[in-house]
UniProtKB/Swiss-Prot annotation:
Locations listed in the record: Cell membrane
Stretches assigned to coiled coil: 54-104
Activity over temperature: Optimum temperature is 80 degrees Celsius.
Membrane protein topology class: Peripheral membrane protein
Summary of pH dependence: Optimum pH is 6.0 for ATP hydrolysis.
Quaternary structure, from the entry: Forms a boomerang-shaped homodimer with arms about 12.0 and 6.8 nm in length with 89% helical content. The N-terminus contacts subunit E. The C-terminus contacts subunit A. The A-type ATPase is composed of subunits A(3), B(3), C, D, E(1 or 2), F, H(2), I and K(x).
GO cellular component: plasma membrane
Lineage of the organism: Archaea, Methanobacteriati, Methanobacteriota, Methanomada group, Methanococci
Domain of life: Archaea
Name of this chain's protein: A-type ATP synthase subunit H
Stated role: Component of the A-type ATP synthase that produces ATP from ADP in the presence of a proton gradient across the membrane.
Length: 104
């Protein structure tokens, strides 16, 4: 009986050692998975930041283009109004000159 008890103790010890070894391997694998997940997350964050940067740049460019178009439109309208005012002023000046001539 002592031989089988000794064998049982050896088997238990071997099983315990194997379990400890498997636990350590599982811990190592978990650390590896964690490190890989962190690296993947860093890549995803960098990609998201790049996408956001591109989106913001596109939005800024679009806003600048719209502002430029609006400024050009305002400038055209202002120039048109200036021309109209000049035309009206010329007509009034000519009318005044004509009335002065008619008075003479």
């Amino acid at each position: 009986m002592s031989v089988s008890v000794m064998e049982a103790i050896k088997e238990v010890k071997l099983a315990e050692e194997q379990a400890v070894k498997e636990i350590e391997e599982a811990k190592n694998r978990a650390e590896q998975i964690k490190a890989e997940a962190i690296e993947e997350a860093k890549k995803l964050i960098a990609e998201a930041e790049e996408e956001a940067k591109k989106l913001v740049e596109e939005m800024i460019k679009k806003a600048e283009e719209e502002a430029k178009k609006e400024a050009e439109k305002i400038l055209e309208e202002t120039e048109k109004e200036i021309k109209e005012i000049i035309s009206i002023a010329k007509v009034k000046i000519l009318s005044l000159k004509l009335s002065e001539i008619l008075e003479i």
